[in-house]
Regions:
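Conserved catalytic core of the tyrosine transesterase superfamily
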Residues: 1-293
Length: 293
């Protein structure tokens, strides 16, 4: 039996995880299978898992990535125990090597505005303008953006209904610039779409955009707009959270808009906010200015 296929089906249809999340789980569990080689799932021991972790660490894979893999493996074995009678979970109690904590990368407000300020009137550029404005305006995850349907938009109210992790829905505000960009895109979309396509963002074929297509378009626009560094979809979500928190100081509101189940996940942005405050302090306070030497 293909246990991995059964587990991925369970994640998609019973737990309601996004295709992108399921793909990531699949990749992590295939890594386990490759490391295990001829050792069966029933015969894997804690010592094997410890050796696999050391191997991954030796390849330069960070503690955060290994922690994610361990979590995926642990969940896989728990599923096998519940559904298929394989009562073996060699990952219980295993911990990944510690890695240095890194804060989410965010663009400055000026960089974010420059990135999304697309003035080209080509159909795909019009779409990309609406897509990036909405990304930044509403702090969406990549999987949430590509899964949006037209009927989730309420431009009159200035909101979008989003299906997030665990199939949970939330209503998120949409900013004025994003509304204007979407109003320009919707008539263009009508000319491209296939008869039964409900997706808000579609490609030349009239079908829903894939996550990879969005990643590629974002990187292309970052280069065109002169934004340096690794610009990826999540950076717009980080930028949204950081900039809203800097302006409002309302952590709970940011938590709601991001769709975080736990406020501790949102609290990382308070560290980014402190970095901003510290920079302002260093530049503005007369007793903070460093002597030039």
């Amino acid at each position: 039996m293909d246990y991995l296929a059964a587990y991925l089906d369970h994640l998609a249809h019973e737990r309601g995880l996004s295709p992108l999340t399921c793909e990531n789980y699949g990749r992590d569990i295939r890594t386990l299978q490759q490391l295990a080689g001829e050792i069966t799932l029933q015969n894997l021991k804690t010592a094997h898992i410890r050796r696999f972790i050391a191997t991954l660490h030796g390849r330069g894979i960070g503690g955060k990535s290994i922690a994610r893999m361990l979590s995926a493996w642990r969940g896989f074995f728990a599923f096998l125990s519940r559904r298929h009678g394989i009562d073996n979970n060699p990952c219980v109690g295993m911990r990944p090597p510690k890695s240095a904590k890194t804060l989410p990368q965010a663009l400055s407000p000026e960089q974010a505005s420059k990135l999304v300020d697309i003035s080209d009137d080509d159909t795909l550029a019009v779409r990309d303008h609406a897509m990036l404005e909405l990304f930044y305006s509403s702090g969406l995850r990549l999987a949430e953006l590509v899964s949006l349907n037209v009927d989730g938009l309420d431009l009159a109210e200035g909101t979008v209904t989003v299906t997030g992790k665990g199939n949970k829905t939330r209503i998120v505000p949409v900013g004025r610039h994003a509304i204007e960009a979407l109003q320009t895109w919707l008539p263009e979309r009508t000319l491209l779409k296939t008869a039964d396509e409900a997706a808000l963002f579609i490609g030349r074929t009239g079908k829903r955009l894939t996550p990879r297509a969005v990643q590629y378009r974002l990187k292309t626009w970052a280069i065109k707009q002169g934004i340096a560094g690794n610009v990826h979809p999540h950076i717009l979500r980080h930028s949204f959270a950081t900039h809203v928190l800097q302006s409002s100081g309302d952590l709970r509101a940011v938590q709601e808009m991001l769709g975080h189940a736990n406020i501790s996940t949102t609290q990382v942005y308070t560290h980014l906010d402190f970095q901003h405050l510290a920079k302002v302090y260093d530049q503005a306070h007369p007793r903070a200015k460093k002597n030039k030497s």
